[in-house]
């Protein structure tokens, strides 16, 4: 009974001090009708009062979404101190990748890394609600979490839901916690970019977002770490195979998702999803030679696409058409044509038995 009373009384993942934050209607909270720069919502999944309110279970789910993918529309409230730029929510700044299993339990185990940063044990779990002192100030820089629960529950936004007659009708939002994304390898579910060493700066890595116009196989080198840092969940699954927890013939389904923000990141303008299937061994030491072969073929496709685009542009120009989008349209059609054949070829590779 006491637990039930606590659930009713306490506010899930909310911060009372956020009541001074930027006010938003329920549409801001609901990711299914998350507002873009387009003011008219066409073919919306909600209409009438349903757009202006949420049930408590709905609000709890979308609270997690807003914390991780919020744009930068919320304004700074503190007047007496200089605050850093907020930036989008943490997941909105990542090129998210995760491994899809045969069922929910399998998926969770494939992505629940017991080691961080390529080998070290996580520190003792400390979710945000178990900190010695709750963080309530806006836009607070903190160290990169050293425990998995801390990473998964970090409050990138301070949010307080508005309730009326058993419904959630809106929220107020402040900027929350953030950490330096440079070499933040505690984050296991992202692609990485590499910044080469310069005269005054050592080499470092930072999260790589997905290109909205690129199929996932075109980012193959980022999955393997050939030219960058291998995503943590990919490394984890290859480790499970090396330890014989997963079979040598294990097939891997990699899912990717991401979002794109508009000017100044004030609104979300597009979203990205893709999936890719291949033998897990292709991403392991056993598949090193094949990794180079696949990357060569990706590069060959890129060069062919450039040639197709150039040819289309020259033919269009010869016909008197000076449309600047001709080349890009031809490249897009080229990739659409080869997309499925390339995926099927990648899926069919068995690095243990197939010859290069």
Please report, for each region that a protein language model flagged, where it lies by residue.
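Beta-strand elements of modular eukaryotic interaction domains
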Residues: 43-45
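Short Cys/His-rich metal-coordination motifs, predominantly Zn2+-binding knuckles/fingers
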Residues: 55-58, 174
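Short functional micro-motifs and their immediate structural scaffolds
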Residues: 60-63
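Flanking scaffold residues of small Cys/His-coordinated metal-binding clusters
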Residues: 47-50
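Glycine-rich, often proline-containing surface loops adjacent to acidic residues and nearby aromatics
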Residues: 52-54, 88-89
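Extended alpha-helical scaffolding segments
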Residues: 1-5, 9-38, 65, 70-356
